[in-house]
Amino acid sequence: MEPPLPVGAQPLATVEGMEMKGPLREPCALTLAQRNGQYELIIQLHEKEQHVQDIIPINSHFRCVQEAEETLLIDIASNSGCKIRVQGDWIRERRFEIPDEEHCLKFLSAVLAAQKAQSQLLVPEQKDSSSWYQKLDTKDKPSVFSGLLGFEDNFSSMNLDKKINSQNQPTGIHREPPPPPFSVNKMLPREKEASNKEQPKVTNTMRKLFVPNTQSGQREGLIKHILAKREKEYVNIQTFRFFVGTWNVNGQSPDSGLEPWLNCDPNPPDIYCIGFQELDLSTEAFFYFESVKEQEWSMAVERGLHSKAKYKKVQLVRLVGMMLLIFARKDQCRYIRDIATETVGTGIMGKMGNKGGVAVRFVFHNTTFCIVNSHLAAHVEDFERRNQDYKDICARMSFVVPNQTLPQLNIMKHEVVIWLGDLNYRLCMPDANEVKSLINKKDLQRLLKFDQLNIQRTQKKAFVDFNEGEIKFIPTYKYDSKTDRWDSSGKCRVPAWCDRILWRGTNVNQLNYRSHMELKTSDHKPVSALFHIGVKVVDERRYRKVFEDSVRIMDRMENDFLPSLELSRREFVFENVKFRQLQKEKFQISNNGQVPCHFSFIPKLNDSQYCKPWLRAEPFEGYLEPNETVDISLDVYVSKDSVTILNSGEDKIEDILVLHLDRGKDYFLTISGNYLPSCFGTSLEALCRMKRPIREVPVTKLIDLEEDSFLEKEKSLLQMVPLDEGASERPLQVPKEIWLLVDHLFKYACHQEDLFQTPGMQEELQQIIDCLDTSIPETIPGSNHSVAEALLIFLEALPEPVICYELYQRCLDSAYDPRICRQVISQLPRCHRNVFRYLMAFLRELLKFSEYNSVNANMIATLFTSLLLRPPPNLMARQTPSDRQRAIQFLLGFLLGSEED
């Protein structure tokens, strides 16, 4: 029973969910209420059998936004619901998961309406000549609430009563999608509590200059833009020492002090950037937030820092086995601001975080830094996959700057980028003995000519524009653990410089680049580099002068001129759009007026996003000075989140974008095109009734087919209506697409090493999708790894999982009773039941060859549970580790049990 609301509080809307506190989840209820004319958000928590209420007033400082799709840690057994962030006056940001997406959106709409209503009630305070602060009428601000909801799907344009793509929750990560469109007002990006209090000091007089303009947010942004252009007038370059280290620890715990690595220079560094790979190799590390190894290595690092200075941890970010720590001298911490972290998994389906990258970006004084720690694909022959991993990390990793209304920043939009990690590039020399002989002769330069990273950089296929210091140390991989002996196992790995540190940017001078042979914990040796980096330090006196001058110039221009834009084109056609295939169209906008201007794409009336979920503009907002031009890219990418409604005809490649010019007019851009339907994202019922490839089926029949299939699934009918009018043959037992993929893997991949653990190649995945959409091939193109990933993508994109949502809880309840488990499966609709049994038979067959393919029952059960047995939307946020374990156990019963009759 929920505790009563405060006296006089009138509830307007309520949602239930979980508050996220690091790895913990606590049940809670969020209630929008009105009391004494004031709107409030009431948070009710259940802590240790006690009820706790927090009340946050809804005023001009209140923020409530929904997150777009993110990857904190890869948890493929979980299917998180909507995530929202709440922040108010003097209150830290709080994060919540709401399981019911539809209710969440309605609740956020109610909060938005309350914010607007409350803003109209605000009465400006009596102005005081001694005070610079003046309350602003919120309604005069430039679309403060437009695009407030930062989610990917534009649900306001959908009929929620229809069968929609209910599986489209942020668990699956496509490898190369454009990021979702973020609202201008999106707040902090994941668990960061960065303070901006150490920015260049702004006096009350300077603040006062901002206020007279009614659109103060726009004005402040324009002045910041002008200040950035005149930066050289008020900054000095000051040199700081950066220590950068990387170590693949092979899942080991620290067994000795790290001083030989971290405290090897006479003078202490100002900043430490320390990256680990393979921190935790346990299966649990892939699916849970907690890791004992994280604590062990973090403490070991803190103990090993330079003894001549005191340090404070600035940030830690971890994705499974990759961890990055940033430490700064305590006297420098106050100059670090705008901290953000991001993670990208490039493992199978872009989910498994065994490979990928983690990064921290920050501003140190007035210079922007991005530190990336990555672990790229293994195996000598897979250098192209490593190149792809690098490109994927660059394409998918973007940061939302805390407390800043700025577009997302990618890695390359920073002034200094340091990239470290186990990049896994090997030597193109198959003879290990020859390599060891050259090492003994200290002929490293000859060996480096065969280094794959050097070759790929020369060919401009990876790490273009990055620099690397001269390598004078012997290869850091592979050794027998606890020794300095080269690998003596049966595989006898060829030594290689897998562990590297590269950088890009100006005023960067590398002093040392070395390995540390003293540490023998792992089969890799740690590597470090010491840098002198020139950092822009603000001279506050000169800054104030430039600031005030910029404001005066702005005042004169605003009084005399209005902004104006010129667009190179306004109509865009995207032809033959396909699932997971990115298309781009570019155009230019030019400031042909006399004053700096701010542009942004804004939502249309009654919309929460400026575009549909398959479209985005990059950049979606920015500043232009007179005669300045910027290129805008319009990107169309159909992911699992939008494929079903496009397949069914509920949506089309049609949209209108509104390009808004502050203090100016709006410009309208027309988007049109055609979409080619895909079997990916089509229901199992519909596919079982298609005897031909989906591209050969008329669109009108596809729509009818999906509608009929939905009704049939709801009624659990055993007999299916045939596709062709007048046809009498029964539907297929399983969709031909699943049969083709599974049959290929059964014939050719049972002995494939690391099956379902190594990602496919992007080009091959697209070939497989096209092949299944357009034909019934005798053989599937691409490698076994690509075919395996295609099968997983297919299962993930299903509108309804193989085990239907309504049977999810029964599956958990019967997880440890094989007899009841089989009874539950027997209640599935016919095609779902057939697909489940077919997949289980195939996976049992794979397990017979585990000696060759490195597949084990726990790994397979964990991976496929997230695809076959997904929790329904109303249970997503409530899913506990126990629920996940029961779901895995349910599948294990079929994988390890005897074959069904």
Curated annotation (Swiss-Prot):
Motif (Clathrin box 2): 702-706
EC number: 3.1.3.36, 3.1.3.56, 3.1.3.86
Main location class: membrane
Segments of this protein annotated with the region Disordered: 164-186
Gene Ontology molecular function terms on file: GTPase activator activity; inositol phosphate phosphatase activity; inositol-1,3,4,5-tetrakisphosphate 5-phosphatase activity; inositol-1,4,5-trisphosphate 5-phosphatase activity; phosphatidylinositol phosphate 4-phosphatase activity; phosphatidylinositol-3,4,5-trisphosphate 5-phosphatase activity; phosphatidylinositol-3,5-bisphosphate 5-phosphatase activity; phosphatidylinositol-4,5-bisphosphate 5-phosphatase activity
Tissue: Brain, skeletal muscle, heart, kidney, lung, placenta and fibroblasts. Expressed in the retina and the retinal pigment epithelium.
UniProt-listed CDD domains: INPP5c_INPP5B (cd09093), PH_OCRL1 (cd13382), RhoGAP_OCRL1 (cd04380)
Short motif Clathrin box 1, span: 73-77
Domain spans labelled Rho-GAP: 721-901
The keyword Membrane appears for this protein: yes
Keyword set includes Cell membrane: no
InterPro entries: Endo/exonu/phosph_ase_sf, Ig-like_fold, IP5, IPPc, OCRL-1_2_ASH, OCRL1/INPP5B_INPP5c, OCRL1_PH, OCRL_clath-bd
Region (5-phosphatase): 237-563
Site (Arginine finger): 757
Keyword entries, A-Z: Cataract, Cell projection, Ciliopathy, Cilium, Cilium biogenesis/degradation, Coated pit, Cytoplasmic vesicle, Disease variant, Endosome, Golgi apparatus, Hydrolase, Lipid metabolism, Lysosome, Membrane
Catalysed reaction, written as an equation: a 1,2-diacyl-sn-glycero-3-phospho-(1D-myo-inositol-4,5-bisphosphate) + H2O = a 1,2-diacyl-sn-glycero-3-phospho-(1D-myo-inositol 4-phosphate) + phosphate; a 1,2-diacyl-sn-glycero-3-phospho-(1D-myo-inositol-3,4,5-trisphosphate) + H2O = a 1,2-diacyl-sn-glycero-3-phospho-(1D-myo-inositol-3,4-bisphosphate) + phosphate; 1D-myo-inositol 1,3,4,5-tetrakisphosphate + H2O = 1D-myo-inositol 1,3,4-trisphosphate + phosphate; 1D-myo-inositol 1,4,5-trisphosphate + H2O = 1D-myo-inositol 1,4-bisphosphate + phosphate
GO CC annotations on file: centriolar satellite; ciliary basal body; cilium; clathrin-coated pit; clathrin-coated vesicle; cytoplasm; cytosol; early endosome
Origin superkingdom: Eukaryota
Record remark: domains: The ASH (ASPM-SPD2-Hydin) and RhoGAP (Rho GTPase activating) domains form a single folding module. The ASH domain has an immunoglobulin-like fold, the Rho-GAP domain lacks the catalytic arginine and is catalytically inactive. The ASH-RhoGAP module regulates the majority of the protein-protein interactions currently described. The ASH domain mediates association with membrane-targeting Rab GTPases. The Rho-GAP domain interacts with the endocytic adapter APPL1, which is then displaced by PHETA1 and PHETA2 as endosomes mature.
Family: Belongs to the inositol 1,4,5-trisphosphate 5-phosphatase type II family.
Known disease link: Lowe oculocerebrorenal syndrome: X-linked multisystem disorder affecting eyes, nervous system, and kidney. It is characterized by hydrophthalmia, cataract, intellectual disability, vitamin D-resistant rickets, aminoaciduria, and reduced ammonia production by the kidney. Ocular abnormalities include cataract, glaucoma, microphthalmos, and decreased visual acuity. Developmental delay, hypotonia, behavior abnormalities, and areflexia are also present. Renal tubular involvement is characterized by impaired reabsorption of bicarbonate, amino acids, and phosphate. Dent disease 2: An X-linked renal disease belonging to the 'Dent disease complex', a group of disorders characterized by proximal renal tubular defect, hypercalciuria, nephrocalcinosis, and renal insufficiency. The spectrum of phenotypic features is remarkably similar in the various disorders, except for differences in the severity of bone deformities and renal impairment.
Function recorded in the entry: Catalyzes the hydrolysis of the 5-position phosphate of phosphatidylinositol 4,5-bisphosphate (PtdIns(4,5)P2) and phosphatidylinositol-3,4,5-bisphosphate (PtdIns(3,4,5)P3), with the greatest catalytic activity towards PtdIns(4,5)P2. Able also to hydrolyze the 5-phosphate of inositol 1,4,5-trisphosphate and of inositol 1,3,4,5-tetrakisphosphate. Regulates traffic in the endosomal pathway by regulating the specific pool of phosphatidylinositol 4,5-bisphosphate that is associated with endosomes. Involved in primary cilia assembly.
Subunit structure: Interacts with APPL1, PHETA1 and PHETA2; APPL1-binding and PHETA1-binding are mutually exclusive. Interacts with clathrin heavy chain. Interacts with several Rab GTPases (in their GTP-bound forms), at least RAB1B, RAB5A, RAB6A, RAB8A, RAB31 and RAB35; these interactions may play a dual role in targeting OCRL to the specific membranes and stimulating the phosphatase activity. Interaction with RAB8A modulates OCRL recruitment to cilia. Interacts with INPP5F.
Designated name of the protein: Inositol polyphosphate 5-phosphatase OCRL
Organism of origin: Homo sapiens (Human)
